[in-house]
């Protein structure tokens, strides 16, 4: 097996230590930045939903503030954002390179995208259900958690899936400018040294990673839709 691998991707075998460390760095960036993105993106998405005109907690100032900041950071290409945030990144984590240096720009790049995804998912919740909950005495937090977030679970899962796949792309771009990870490995040891097998393996690894995330997202989304749950109950009867 080892001889066969060495014959089809000799350079990957030679740099196997670097390859596995780059995979680990990519996973670290993805998980840490993804966690922050999930938290802050959900908060901002909910804020945009409830503070808009006609929302359950209408607040024009807060809505305009969050909406404007989201639009500003969404409009900046990620590579430019990486450079722009170098001073802030150094102030927060002490460095602008490596995995630690990539977390801040990754969060700033992914949160606005996920915020819009959450806002769109919550917009699909029927206003009638919100009004019904309010008429039964539910408070604002109750409506947010028991109506908006509960009813939008399938769409929110799709939003998380799309954002996770997008975040993988951002981690590879971050690697191209010194953050490490698979993107950095593909450029430094693949393209720069003309080792095509390294580039090919990096592409395959990323494709597998994306396919797993997409498959999990699709499965969870189907399982949490009312139609899927209804069909499951009928079949079990």
Say what each PLM segment does.
Residues 1-22:
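Short, strongly hydrophobic alpha-helical membrane anchors
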Residues 19, 23, 27, 65, ...:
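Hydrophobic alpha-helical elements at and bordering transmembrane segments
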Residues 20-123, 158-165, 205-213:
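Membrane-water interface segments at the C-terminal ends of transmembrane alpha-helices
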Residues 47-56, 89, 93, 126, ...:
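Membrane-interfacial segments
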Residues 47-53, 135, 199-237:
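C-terminal transmembrane helix and the adjacent membrane-cytosol boundary/short C-terminal tail
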Residues 122-152, 192:
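Short helix-to-coil transition segments within interhelical loops
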Residues 140-171:
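Transmembrane alpha-helices
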Residues 170-200, 205, 225, 230-233:
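Glycine-rich helix-loop "coupling/hinge" segments at transmembrane-helix boundaries
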């Amino acid at each position: 097996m080892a001889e066969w691998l060495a014959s089809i991707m000799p350079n990957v075998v030679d740099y196997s230590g670097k390859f596995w460390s780059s995979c680990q760095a990519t996973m670290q960036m993805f998980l840490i930045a993804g966690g922050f993105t999930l938290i802050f993106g959900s908060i901002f998405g909910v804020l945009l939903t409830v503070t808009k005109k006609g929302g359950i907690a209408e607040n024009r100032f807060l809505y305009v503030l969050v909406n404007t900041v989201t639009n500003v950071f969404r409009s900046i290409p990620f590579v430019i954002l990486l450079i722009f945030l170098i001073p802030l990144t150094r102030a927060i984590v002490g460095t602008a390179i490596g995995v630690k240096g990539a977390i801040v720009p990754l969060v700033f790049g992914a949160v606005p995208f996920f915020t819009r995804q959450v806002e769109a998912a919550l917009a699909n919740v029927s206003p009638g259900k919100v009004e019904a909950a309010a008429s039964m005495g539910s408070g604002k937090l109750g409506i947010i958690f028991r109506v908006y977030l509960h009813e939008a679970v399938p769409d929110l899962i799709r939003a998380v899936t799309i954002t996770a796949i997008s975040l993988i792309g951002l981690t590879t771009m971050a690697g191209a400018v010194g953050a490490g990870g698979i993107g950095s490995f593909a450029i430094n040891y693949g393209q720069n040294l003309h080792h095509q097998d390294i580039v090919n393996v990096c592409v395959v690894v990323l494709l597998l990673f994306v396919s797993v995330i997409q498959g999990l997202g699709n499965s969870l989304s189907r399982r949490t839709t009312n139609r899927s749950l209804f069909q499951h109950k009928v079949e079990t009867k």
